[in-house]
């Protein structure tokens, strides 16, 4: 997901300096739309101040099928500093996370300003930014579509945004859902 998100951010910067990106997974069901809108508003405030935001789902059980986000217990207007991303745990560890109360399921949904994302991604995974930037600079326009340069885009490391950036940055907050 990192190259695709980087492409969206770089392209949006061509159109507007202050672009914000909201990256949503297609496999989520949002049951409480009002709470989701409130979470987006909270994240937006954090993002405007230069943070990278992710959304964590408050766990309802000790689940071994999800990665977790350990958050600070301090609350900054509804957001918490991310202390650690953790891989899918065994059942005993998941139960401990549930009991501690400051672990959230990793939703894979994010919000950031395009320029902040690119700055952070350049710091932590510059090879992705360089390849994707080359793909955009050599893109072609096809009706309403932008066709990235295939060879340049394929030269980018295939990495998730979690591994390429979110787990490496100390500038990440999580908003509970």
Give each language-model segment a name.
Residues 1-74, 123-124:
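Conserved beta-loop-beta/alpha segment of the NTase-like Rossmann-fold superfamily
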Residues 68-177:
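Catalytic core of tubulin tyrosine ligase-like
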